[in-house]
């Protein structure tokens, strides 16, 4: 099974070796035909504490690192 790759923005970098990334998803509501925007937060492994709040990053699914972390940062997309 291929690993999922998502793109999002760092909303918290307060924890050691962990960042919280918000990933936005847009879709058209089937009944109301309006574009709906949904955001989901992921705990992401950042071993070198390189990323700060507001950075755009690309994340990939990985093996479980802790109870809530199963994503890693693979690329920095700039600010």
From Swiss-Prot:
KW Ribonucleoprotein (keyword) present: yes
Superkingdom of the organism of origin: Bacteria
GO molecular function terms noted in the UniProt entry: rRNA binding; structural constituent of ribosome
Cellular component terms per the entry's GO annotation: cytosolic small ribosomal subunit
Record has RNA-binding as a keyword: yes
Keywords: Ribonucleoprotein, Ribosomal protein, RNA-binding, rRNA-binding
One of the GO BP terms on file: translation
Family affiliation: Belongs to the universal ribosomal protein uS17 family.
Annotated HAMAP family: Ribosomal_uS17_B (MF_01345_B)
Role summary: One of the primary rRNA binding proteins, it binds specifically to the 5'-end of 16S ribosomal RNA.
PANTHER family membership: 40S RIBOSOMAL PROTEIN S11 FAMILY MEMBER (PTHR10744), SMALL RIBOSOMAL SUBUNIT PROTEIN US17M (PTHR10744:SF1)
Assembly information from the UniProt record: Part of the 30S ribosomal subunit.
Protein name per its UniProtKB record: Small ribosomal subunit protein uS17
Native organism: Orientia tsutsugamushi (strain Boryong)
